[in-house]
């Protein structure tokens, strides 16, 4: 029997509840609910708003956390950034072969695709606490917990992650550097691109 942090019985599986952009220039988060076309990865309705220091309120409905936010039209720039995250993550899922509930949730949200030339993959390890890939002409993409991707500190990002963790989410950060790291070390110039909010799937009674 699997339980979440609150003791609720779960299926032992996870899902990506939301994908959010992180704007390093303005230290803001693009807030939206996770409603996407499974074929194209594009938002199926206007479900995004750009707001500084967004506060999320959550309520329990049928055992699952439902976000209550003010929804506004997603801008073209934000839509392109979300599509780029889908593109990168699809390629990463095709070269990373982790077998666990989190990886399964990511593969379900980001179907594998193989249209970027891989230089080398960076598999997850218990020492590094992150995984990633280096693509030709694109640089390095890493995915993991914020404190391991940015051990030197990124206060604003850590505050955002902490606020979502208090709501019961597990947060993974996608980060990018234009540098092509030669091994498994974090490259210079690493910047956060987005956050994946992951929840346990509640078992139906």
Per-region residue spans from a language model:
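Short, acidic loop-to-helix structural element flanking the phosphoryl-transfer center
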Residues: 198-205
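Cytosolic catalytic regions of ATP/NTP-dependent phosphoryl-transfer enzymes
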Residues: 1-192, 198
């Amino acid at each position: 029997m699997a339980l979440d942090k609150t003791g609720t019985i779960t299926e032992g599986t996870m899902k990506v509840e939301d994908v959010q952009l992180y704007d390093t220039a303005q230290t803001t988060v693009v807030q939206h609910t996770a409603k996407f076309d499974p074929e194209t990865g594009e938002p199926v309705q206007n479900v995004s708003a750009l707001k500084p220091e967004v506060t999320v309120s959550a309520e329990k409905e049928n055992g699952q956390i439902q976000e209550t936010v003010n929804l506004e039209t997603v801008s073209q720039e934000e839509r392109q950034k979300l599509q780029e995250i889908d593109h990168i993550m699809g390629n990463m899922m095709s070269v990373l072969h982790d077998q666990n509930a989190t990886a399964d949730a990511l593969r379900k949200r980001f179907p594998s695709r193989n249209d970027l030339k891989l230089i080398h993959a960076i598999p997850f390890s218990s020492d590094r606490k992150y995984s990633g890939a280096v693509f030709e002409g694109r640089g390095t993409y890493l995915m993991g917990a914020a404190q391991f991707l940015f051990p030197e500190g990124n206060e604003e990002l850590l505050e955002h992650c902490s606020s979502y963790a208090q709501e019961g989410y597990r947060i993974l950060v996608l980060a990018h550097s234009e540098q092509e790291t030669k091994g498994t070390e974090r490259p210079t110039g690493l910047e956060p691109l987005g956050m994946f909010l992951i929840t346990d799937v509640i078992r139906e009674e």
